[in-house]
Design a protein with these regions (language model features):
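Extended, low-complexity, intrinsically disordered C-terminal regulatory tails
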Residues: 8-44
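N-terminal, Lys/Arg- and Ser/Thr-rich interaction peptides
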Residues: 1-3
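Catalytic cores and adjacent binding grooves of peptidoglycan-active enzymes
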Residues: 5-9, 32, 40-45, 49-53, ...
Length: 105
């Protein structure tokens, strides 16, 4: 699901894959994108490059939230950063091997 008003134009294919995996990790809970290439983020945020999205967490309790977060982090692997923020889970495609970038493809 995508929150009303969220702009997903410009998301990279990697983020589409990440969202598909996130939906499986959320299981019985709704997996809602609350921010993508829209919104206000830090000046060097990967949101502006289409390489990050935020997922809603307000409907998850403590144990459920931790379970989803840990499963997502494990499932996405080391090419993605998964950060548990106070009101969302931030997911970004940030491969550590910088020899190949989106622009090179």
């Amino acid at each position: 699901m995508i929150k009303s008003g969220v702009d997903i134009r410009g998301l990279t294919p990697q983020m589409a894959i990440a969202y598909t995996i996130a939906c499986r990790c959320y299981g019985q809970y709704d997996c809602v994108i609350t921010s993508a290439s829209d919104g206000k983020h830090g000046p060097n945020s990967l949101h502006y490059k289409g390489q990050a999205l935020d997922l809603r967490t307000r409907h998850l309790n403590g144990q459920g939230l931790q379970a989803v977060y840990l499963k997502l982090k494990e499932s996405l692997g080391e090419q993605f950063d998964v950060v548990l923020e106070s009101d969302h889970i931030h997911v970004e495609w940030d491969p550590k091997d910088k020899s190949i970038s989106v622009e090179d493809r």
